[in-house]
UniProtKB/Swiss-Prot annotation:
Keyword Nucleotide-binding: yes
Any one Gene Ontology BP term: negative regulation of nuclear-transcribed mRNA poly(A) tail shortening
One Pfam family matching this protein: MTPAP-like_central
Catalysed transformations (reactions): RNA(n) + ATP = RNA(n)-3'-adenine ribonucleotide + diphosphate
The EC number(s) this enzyme carries: 2.7.7.19, 2.7.7.-
Protein's name in the database: Terminal nucleotidyltransferase 4A
Source organism (scientific name): Mus musculus (Mouse)
Length: 785
């Protein structure tokens, strides 16, 4: 069982798990190196469940704002280190465990192995050092009395003193496999099977003594009992999104990092312009996501080395973390902020992301369920170290385009509705890209409504002599550019998607209701887990930046965010005012009860990550657009006045008289509402007043809880194998279709219920259709585009 792909499921736990892991290790030739230690051993621990959190909170009360002293302003983020190995792991390793105990690491070894595969591509070497492995250590100590899962005890308290120093009485930090940089990824669950292979009491609880810790399932978002089947998965995805969505403290911390780097840039080039792009601009970032910056100026060549020296001089970044990738497609500087451990990628004169950011934000408005899928999929790939191209995964831009294409071409549902089942969509996404999609012959097209096209057709428009890659995605903004051309590990991603489909489809099947652990185990937790390191890191951020959330001084006037709760019976009401001449926009959370209110003074450019720029998108020229994200705590929203009524959105154009059954234009048959009514969906309308330079009004709605589908696991794209669909002539008057069917949803109207009429009625003559046109409410067949 590959620890990078699959986990031991709750029903599979037993005494033979450790033996099966050893058999897999022997068959793969793993662990036969010089040290005899498994290089993929997981360094992170699963997070405590919400039910067990009070005990952990009690132990960490002094550091969390209790009677103890407050953390120092200069204290680094928690950096837990491992101690003794679990008994189950020692049994699984056998003779390798003795080598693991004697395993030491010198600074020279850390220096030589700390360079990533990105440096190998660029041909540049940075001064190597590793603060987490600078001292010679051993993995286990006989008298330590600490278990492998005691990370949270040391992580709950911020360690004072300089970085790299080991406090007295605490286990030294060690990096097991720096070549893969597992230690830098706090969310990594690589090798989690070793922690799951032993008995639950010995492995997850650290023994059965009185001081044993609570079980760590790694599902801190699970705070209630969910419905059975696919409906429960839908509810759990919503809770996961609300739990992992960025909080105002995290946004404030990232703005401070940007401000420090911007100060260094302004000292060098006073006329330079520093802008933000990437997930920070769109709000689709995880707690450990990086920050992408672009510096605009007048240079013939990007001054990478000059900025690198300035960053070292001002001690902005960890000296060992600064890497210059000057041989990449787009030269960038990669660094890690010294105070917050946030990774930052800096590029020069890269304006490609401006249009890409607007493109993704427009689709986020069009598909209100898109952010939920993206956040789950990002976490799914991040914990498996498949979220970047140079680590063998795919870029976030490729992932977003795949999700957009999936929603565009879904044959049965209208993805623009806010009451679709997220659990159904997630399972079908894994089924499509894990099993059904033909990566060898098919490419993905997003523009013009979306389509699946042959790679031969894409190759005709390819530039620079490139051939279509395994994961071929046509760039919707740059024709001829293949977004996934550098994703050499696309088949690995396909494998994990297939694994996720198998696990989730079994978990939501009717047979799963007979499992003895059906009420205690998390369905989403079978494929996604949150580590305790991420939880401690977020708690440290909230403690340190909780008192710094103030209105941004860069805004001209105060911004008041207003919220009005209404009910819209499952329909999403979207209305917004024209944007200002300064092209500043407001990005709001689509589901969280906390609206975004803390202003960001930095500008956004794109939703691409640093690896996307490095490998996927060639540079182009386009005007700069300043963006920022606003967030607000829930307590502030209760005292704000209600918003004024806002006009409805632009109505959809009238449908044409020809129905083309292709991937671009699809036939949708409305289904009569179920007998069990769906509860009205609370919708929030948020308006922004106060300045003339900022005008944005968005409707924010939480996805409703739809009724369970009778066939939740059918293939989502069975109707898209043909590229040239037949045309059906629609005779008679079609003027009445504009007010009903599919087009009425886009204009904010309520869709009237339509009976389930058979297809034989469409063979009527034209005069009879005209005669009864005024008696119909709407046609059961509506045109999508």
């Amino acid at each position: 069982m590959d620890p990078r792909v699959a986990w031991i499921q709750p029903e599979q736990k037993g005494p033979a798990n450790a033996l099966w892991m050893q058999i897999w290790e022997t068959s793969q030739g793993v662990g036969r190196g010089g040290s005899g230690f498994a290089s993929y051993f997981c360094l992170n621990s699963p997070a405590l469940d919400t039910a067990a959190a009070p005990g952990a909170a009690g132990r960490a009360a002094p550091a969390a704002g209790g009677p103890g002293p407050a953390p120092a302003a200069s204290s680094p983020p928690p950096a837990p280190g491992p101690a003794a190995l679990p008994p189950a792991l020692l049994t699984a390793l056998g003779p390798a465990a003795d080598s693991a105990r004697r395993l030491h690491k010198s600074p020279s070894l850390s220096s030589s192995s700390s360079s990533s595969s990105s440096n190998a591509e660029s041909g540049t070497e940075s001064p190597g050092c590793s603060s987490s492995s600078s001292s010679s250590t051993s993995l286990g100590r006989a008298g330590s009395g600490r278990t492998f899962f005691s990370f949270a005890d040391g992580a709950a308290h911020a360690h004072p003193g300089p970085r790299g120093s080991t406090p007295a009485g605490s286990p030294p930090q060690h990096q097991f496999h720096p070549g893969r940089r597992k230690r830098e990824n706090k969310a990594s669950t690589y090798g989690l099977n070793y922690l799951l292979s032993g008995s639950r009491a010995a492995t997850l609880s650290g023994g059965g003594g009185p001081g044993a810790q609570a079980a760590r399932p790694g599902t801190p978002w699970k705070s209630r009992a969910y419905s059975p089947g696919i409906q429960g998965l839908h509810e759990e995805i919503i809770d996961f999104y609300n739990f992992m969505s960025p909080c105002p403290e995290e946004a404030a911390m990232r703005r401070e990092v940007v401000k420090r780097i911007e100060t260094v840039v302004k000292d060098l080039w006073p006329t330079a312009d520093v802008q933000i792009f990437g997930s920070f601009s769109t709000g689709l970032y995880l707690p450990t996501s990086d920050i992408d910056l672009v510096v605009f100026g007048k240079w013939e060549r990007p001054p990478l080395q000059l900025l690198e020296q300035a960053l070292r001089k001002h001690n902005v970044a960890e000296p060992c973390s600064i890497k210059v990738l000057d041989k990449a497609t787009v030269p960038i500087i990669k660094l890690t902020d010294q105070e917050t451990e946030v990774k930052v990628d800096i590029s020069f004169n890269m304006e490609t992301g401006v249009r890409a950011a607007e493109f993704i934000k427009n689709y986020m408005k069009k598909y209100s369920l898109l952010p939920y899928l993206i956040l789950v999929l990002k976490q799914f790939l991040l914990q498996r170290d498949l979220n970047e191209v140079f680590t063998g995964g795919i870029s976030s831009y490729s992932l977003i385009l795949m999700a957009i294409s999936f929603l565009q071409l879904h044959p049965r549902i209208d993805a623009r509705r806010a009451d679709e089942n997220l659990g159904m969509l997630l399972v079908e996404f894994f089924e499509l890209y894990g099993r059904n999609f033909n990566y060898l012959k098919t490419g993905i097209r997003i523009k013009e409504g979306g389509a699946y096209i042959a790679k031969e057709e894409i190759m005709k428009a390819m530039t620079s002599g490139y051939r279509p890659s395994m994961l071929c995605i046509e760039d919707p903004l740059l024709p001829g550019n293949d977004v996934g051309r550098s994703s050499y590990g696309a088949m690995q991603v396909k494998q994990v998607f297939d694994y996720a489909y198998i696990v989730l489809s079994h978990a939501v099947s009717p047979l799963a209701r007979s499992y003895p652990n059906r009420d205690s185990e998390s369905t989403l937790g079978r494929i996604i887990k949150v580590t305790q390191e991420v939880i401690d890191y977020r708690r440290w951020i909230k403690e340190k930046w909780g008192s710094r959330i103030l209105p941004s001084p860069d805004l001209d006037n105060r911004i008041k965010i207003k919220e009005r709760i209404t009910t819209c019976n499952g329909e999403q009401m979207q209305s917004r005012e024209p944007s200002s001449p300064y092209t500043q926009r407001l990005t709001l959370s689509l589901s969280s009860p906390q609206l975004l209110s803390s202003g960001s003074s930095a500008s956004s450019v794109s939703s691409l990550s640093g690896s996307d720029i490095d490998s996927d998108t060639p540079p182009c020229t386009t005007p700069s657009v300043y963006q920022f994200s606003l967030q607000a705590p829930t307590t502030l929203m209760a005292s704000l006045p209600t918003a004024l009524p806002m006009p409805s959105s632009k109505p959809q154009p009238a449908a044409s008289r020809t129905l083309i059954m292709t991937t671009n234009n699809q036939t949708r048959v409305t289904i009569p509402p179920p007998t069990l009514g769906v509860a009205p969906v609370p919708c929030r309308q948020a308006g922004v007043d106060g300045t003339t330079s900022l005008k944005a009004v968005h409707s924010v709605t939480s996805p409703a809880i739809p009724s369970a589908s009778p066939n939740p696991l059918s293939s989502p794209h069975l109707y898209h194998k043909q590229h040239n669909g037949m045309k059906l002539s629609m005779k008679g008057s079609h003027n009445h279709t504009q007010g009903g069917g599919y087009s009425s949803v886009g204009s904010g109207a309520v869709r009237p219920p339509v009976g389930n009429r058979g297809h034989h009625q469409y063979n009527r003559t034209g005069w009879r259709r005209k005669k009864h046109a005024h008696t119909r409410d709407s046609l059961p067949v509506s045109l999508s585009r």
